[in-house]
């Protein structure tokens, strides 16, 4: 199934003025587009609310971009039309902005190598000359011993003394990994493009101002690279940076994008440390958490059982290294998320409700999409809409009962 429910509240006695949180995890380009399609389906499922009416927005990686717009009262339709159809009020990120090569670090690599070689060579020469000169008593002894008794043994002893002294030791890495750039691409142009959208549409790019004007709580999650700790940006958290800069830090997927430095601190993709950060939404008082994770591992056995058109697939191992990496990343993200779901299901102190939306485990068409391809945005969005619409239909009875307790009416029938 594409929906997992943790229902712990007393639905017969709904809370007054409950807080509803929308938690959006990562997923790169295809995952972000899949989420937009799914959020459109969720919007259509709800009669008297839409997702931008929620109280708390937590965004991780690609989810941080969508969360930032929703918290600014931009509709899902406008985000979708702009980012997928590329004809709405927002400007979609262009290929040259997304694939902005980290040229500075890449071009510096040969210079670093030459500089280190020059430094090591000069230090070795200086060390050799300073360690082996006629004014050193030990050097004179070794030289005298060889001169008075020239032989292969005395020559070996003399050269060993010259080249094996401690003064010649130079500290340098045994494997020069530090010569590799810290990311293929950089996110500066993505941030600038997003900031232009904010400016042109008069959106709040300040956490404090956004909360003051709208009452919406926006939180963006990244990871502090040097401490491996979760970094949370928000009006009552780290609020000293722009929303678009926090988003830039959150989307910096390791190796693909270089780390983002903000005030001397390096950040990478928030999904590295937490898949969704549902715990933070609950900590901030959310009674109902609607969480959307687009990356779920593919199950070949489930595909064979739920494949009405009889299509056949080769195994993931035979599909190449990209498919293996895709499955590994999805498994890591999904497994952590399931541990969190189990924690709240088993925790007697948790009295809220969680609705987790994901693709089905047999969705091979979405699994096959390149996560970093801008060309697959429309396909991913379509899959997201179809997948979530189908899951909402299948779980309608349970969802209708839970949402009703929070004042949300579900549509009688979905097309």
Q: Which residues make up each language-model segment?
A:
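Patatin-like phospholipase
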Residues: 1-60, 68-415
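Catalytic cores of secreted/periplasmic lytic hydrolases that degrade extracellular macromolecules
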Residues: 63
């Amino acid at each position: 199934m594409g929906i997992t429910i943790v229902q712990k509240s007393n639905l017969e006695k709904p809370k007054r003025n409950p807080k509803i949180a929308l938690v959006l995890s990562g997923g790169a380009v295809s995952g972000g587009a899949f989420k937009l399609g799914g959020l459109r389906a969720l919007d259509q499922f709800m009669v008297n609310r839409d997702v931008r009416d929620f109280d708390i927005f937590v965004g991780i990686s690609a989810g941080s971009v969508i969360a930032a717009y929703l918290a600014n009262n931009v509709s899902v339709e406008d985000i979708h039309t702009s980012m997928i159809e590329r004809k709405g009020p927002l400007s979609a990120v262009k290929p040259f902005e997304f694939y902005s090569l980290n040229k500075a670090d890449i071009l510096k690599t040969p210079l670093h190598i030459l500089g280190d070689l020059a430094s090591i060579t000069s230090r070795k020469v200086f060390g050799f000359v300073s360690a082996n000169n006629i004014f050193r008593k030990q050097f004179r002894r070794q030289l005298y011993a060889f001169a008075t008794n020239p032989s292969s043994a005395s020559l070996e002893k003399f050269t060993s003394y010259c080249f094996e002294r401690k003064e010649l030791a130079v500290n340098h890495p045994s494997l020069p990994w530090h010569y590799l750039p810290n990311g293929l691409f950089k996110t500066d142009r993505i941030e600038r493009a997003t900031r232009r959208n904010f400016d042109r549409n008069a959106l709040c790019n300040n956490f404090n101002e956004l909360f003051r004007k709208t009452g919406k709580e926006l939180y963006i999650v990244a990871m502090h690279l040097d401490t491996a700790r979760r970094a949370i940006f928000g009006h009552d958290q780290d609020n000293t940076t722009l929303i678009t800069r926090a988003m830039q830090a959150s989307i910096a997927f390791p190796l693909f994008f270089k780390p983002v430095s903000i005030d001397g601190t390096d950040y990478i993709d928030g999904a590295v440390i937490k898949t969704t950060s549902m715990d933070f939404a609950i900590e901030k008082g959310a009674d109902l958490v609607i969480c959307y994770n687009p990356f779920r591992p593919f199950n070949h056995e489930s595909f064979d059982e739920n494949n009405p058109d009889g299509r056949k697939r080769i195994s993931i191992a035979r599909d190449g290294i990209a498919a293996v990496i895709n499955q590994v990343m999805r498994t890591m993200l999904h497994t952590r998320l399931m541990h969190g779901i189990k924690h709240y299901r088993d925790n007697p102190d948790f009295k809220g409700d969680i609705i987790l939306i994901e693709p089905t485990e047999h969705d091979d068409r979405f699994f096959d999409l390149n996560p970093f391809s801008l060309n697959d945005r429309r396909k991913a969005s379509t899959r997201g809409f179809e997948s979530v619409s189908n899951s909402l239909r299948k779980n309608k009875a349970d969802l209708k009962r839970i949402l009703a307790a929070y004042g949300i009416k579900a549509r009688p029938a979905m097309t």
